[in-house]
């Protein structure tokens, strides 16, 4: 996967790329999109975009797959500085990208906030759970690939240009306590241009520095400095001062 991923935006559909295709082909394309649920996705995206801005803005600030389960409390804040794409992401791997995976879930509890600080893509099956009075901020050009989970009880901040792979889990809370009085919830901070490999897990209290790489399957329990590569469970430094190529 690379930053070359073609994200599917609210103002562009796959078939629009073939604007010069013959009339019959175009109608076939439209019919295919309607049958595949694209029309429903646009309707749902219009609803969320209007709810966000209070009027219809083009291009739509929110583009959401119709299957996405949205649950945003009345007192919650959804802030989108540029655009949020949910449930659509075509990778260069395979012919069908990541279509057909699980539905997305976006949940923001009472008083919670989800702040999208630019253009952010959440791939199919990604679940974003922001608890009551909790805050999740995601920076410009960051993307999260299929089936990852961002679980926020207190505060999670993800910088810009981050690549978060498949099946990653970020949790700022343990949910339960081992020792009485011990802190089981602490802020997670992910810097800019961080690459988090598939099936990695980032636990409470961790800060990851700019440009760091988290290897596939790593369980990160301690801070990672800028430019480090960490791997394993618990994650240990395996390389330093790297520059990964998007
Ligand atoms: C992090 C990663 C990119 C590093 O690649 P690399 O620079 O070629 O690293 P190396 O293969 O030189 O490995 C360096 C050391 O870390 C270890 N290591 C690398 N990845 C590891 C992993 N996922 N888990 C445990 N150890 C790992 C290697 O065994 C090696 O150990 P050694 O020095 O004792 O031999 C790569 O290991 C990785 O995790 N790739 C998967 C990325 C991914 O999930 N992509 C999905 C799409 S975004």
Where do the language-model regions lie?
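Domain-scale signature associated with acetyltransferase and cell-envelope carbohydrate enzymes
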Residues: 2-169, 191-193, 226, 235-239, ...
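Glycine-rich hexapeptide-repeat left-handed beta-helix
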Residues: 160-246
